[in-house]
Amino acid sequence: MTPSSYGQVAVLMGGNSNEREISLQSGHAVLRALLELSIDAFAFDTKHETLTGLKKYDSAFICLHGKDGEDGKIQSILDAMGIRYTGSNAQASAYGMDKYKSKEIFLAANIPTPKFLLLNEKSNFRDVSKELDNPFFIKASNSGSSIGVYKVSTEEQFQHALHEAKKIDDIVFAEENISGREL
């Protein structure tokens, strides 16, 4: 493909998630690379520009992180506008962003996944520790990167992690610790 075959490309960045700053860094790096390739690319910060402004672009390079960028929302909007974009479709993005839903899909497909327990306001450290070896993790289901992920080995850490994770998402779960290198 030639640079002109992409048309005008909106590099979507920034947004409103708790990962805004890293999204801006990623977006500007992608914008520089596209411009170096002579692609007609433009920065588009979804926090400061209305999404209807996307109609003037032929395609979008998604550099939004977390909520509204990786959860299928922006993909659904781009689909409705008929704008092609990078990454997975809306449904795959939504499933990929939801850690708990992903684990259910893995189990249904017989794909091994660390043991986990859905938590609620009645959950307590002692009961979770009986089910999962100590230490374990508490995770907000819908959050990108490692935001909303807490390693827990005490009652105090458990209470703090549960409280903080609930600020991010209503669905929070505990997951066993698996030692190894993260890829």
Label the predicted regions.
Residues L117-L119, V149-T154:
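Short beta-strand-to-turn element immediately C-terminal to the catalytic PLP-Schiff-base lysine
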